[in-house]
């Protein structure tokens, strides 16, 4: 979770998100991303972002494509908003959300990769693997 602590107003990535405070950040995961999703949800809410958590509501085993599709469908009618998708490795849910032409999901492993995916590739979904983040 070191990357979450690095976020602050002086960070260029965070500055880019400032305009997003008026839009929504959708969160989705499978059971393997449940804990990280909760941490991110609390962090975003504490920093005054509008957050909609698409689930799951419990840490029971669920299928990542179901929640990836939920996230993609929310973004379909809301091009100003973005999403964060989480599963164990990030790979499965990344494949699931990238099936839709309006989604540009980037599986990232560093703050710099996240910043560049937004800046250079106009990524609208950040994908993380809970089992791969220390």
What are these regions (language model features)?
Residues 92-103, 112:
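Short Gly/Thr/Asp-enriched flexible loops that form oxyanion-binding sites at enzyme active sites
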Residues 35-46:
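Short, solvent-exposed amphipathic alpha-helices that sit
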Residues 66-85, 89:
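Short, structured active-site "lid" loops
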Residues 21-25:
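Extreme N-terminal starter segment of soluble prokaryotic enzymes
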Residues 50-61:
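A short beta-strand-loop structural module common to alpha/beta enzyme folds
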Residues 26-28, 32-35, 111-134:
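C-terminal binding/interaction regions
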């Amino acid at each position: 979770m070191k990357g979450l602590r690095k976020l602050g107003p002086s960070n260029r990535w965070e500055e880019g998100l400032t305009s997003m405070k008026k839009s929504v950040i959708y969160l989705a995961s499978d059971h393997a991303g449940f804990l990280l999703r909760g941490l991110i949800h609390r962090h975003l809410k504490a920093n005054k972002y509008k957050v909609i958590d698409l689930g799951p509501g419990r840490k029971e085993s669920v299928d990542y494509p179901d929640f990836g599709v939920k996230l993609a469908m929310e973004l379909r009618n809301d091009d100003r908003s973005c999403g964060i998708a989480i599963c164990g490795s990030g790979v499965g849910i990344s494949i699931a959300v990238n099936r839709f032409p309006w989604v540009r999901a980037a599986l990232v492993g560093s703050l710099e990769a996240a910043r560049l995916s937004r800046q250079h590739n106009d990524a609208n979904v950040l994908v993380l693997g809970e089992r791969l983040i220390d």
